[in-house]
């Protein structure tokens, strides 16, 4: 009886709206371009909400990531298990008890957690959700390239002040699914003699980055790689098989994925999903490949959060993950960004190599108080991921040196300070670059990205059984670099060494060894009189357009094989 009275009292406090606070006051709630409101949602309709519970020992987790990722540390390569991570960050008993009582009082019944117990996903009716989260008002929206339907609130939500120490944020209210940034460029005109290639294929990738027909997985090691797909993006096995028939004849490969985690729909294949799978499996050839499919098919789901929760619920995971997802930093609440950054830190502690596309808007641009500034993207700006930029061939039809792909995302975070591992490289760039934009356009003390790059221009992809040319974007360069790292992991595992894990501390210590330095070109930015559409420019060593450069496989293997 005492517990029931306590719960009723807590729920009464919630309903009154007294002593409440907003966990995400800075979350942007303007409707993204391409989305349309369809009006209020039915009060009896059900939706799922994800509650991010406050974790413990995050600072200690950060220290452990540094220890297991730094080659000079005696702990290098001694990664944590999922169970180790869970023991470290699991919310306190008080947090678990308080949140569970609160949800029970609100009528939430269908809830499930993850092994780390720091996420809780519950199904509620719209009526219950609006009572639970005062201020929220759920509407239907449709948008995106596949006419996706979502339920979101255009208004901020409140939580009882008593929950402030226990809940970071509630997912499924504000953030819209990201749209694909892939571009299909016009076919360049061939002039003069016939070129050596008519678009980027696996054979072009392998020739440029010095991969021989023998540089494939053994098929016997405990090695695997993965890509993640969102927003109703699916691949088809038949497309993968046709792609390998067309372009995989000169190297051993696998023609099907080993495992799909999540929901793999039966709709039309998406170009981005097809690209991710086909080039991860041709660069990292003959290596077991997983696909994480988090399409966000239910209207209340946030696909990226779903993927993070899948990582927190699997003990045995692929060693390399490539992700072509990103949002503008300024479009996300600080609570959301900081918590997602902790999730990426958890993955790094477990020895996972996470590669994120740097984006396809150059330095980006937005207006702050009437003045233009560059616009960094997240998670590309996280200090716990390896971010991949994009390049083009200097001569479009010749396998030659690379230059900047002008769309390649890059810049400096407005949220995360510069990590110590890149202090020397970034300081050198800022002090020596002859073409720096005005200092008012970027945060010179922020985490700088990308870290590396690969070709991002003019790919061939098979989608819905149709070969499609001239697909471009860092969504292409990211799986290519990921596949090459998987080949290096293959050698490390077969020689009794741990996989590479979080790569950045080692990458910056080696000052670009094993990479082709890209020194020509600039990327795009604000179209104004001051910068005239030009962002940062590449140069010798690290730069915020192509990072340390593109992979030279034999040299990179030699550099990363030991210890």
From Swiss-Prot:
Signal peptide: 1-19
Cofactor note: Binds 1 Ca(2+) ion per subunit.
Keyword terms: Autocatalytic cleavage, Calcium, Disulfide bond, Glycoprotein, Hydrolase, Lysosome, Metal-binding, Protease, Serine protease, Signal, Zymogen
Subcellular location, record wording: Lysosome; Melanosome
UniProt binding sites for Ca(2+): 517-518, 539, 541, 543
Propeptide boundaries: 20-195
Job description of the protein: Lysosomal serine protease with tripeptidyl-peptidase I activity. May act as a non-specific lysosomal peptidase which generates tripeptides from the breakdown products produced by lysosomal proteinases. Requires substrates with an unsubstituted N-terminus.
Name of this protein: Tripeptidyl-peptidase 1
Organism: Pan troglodytes
Gene (name only): TPP1
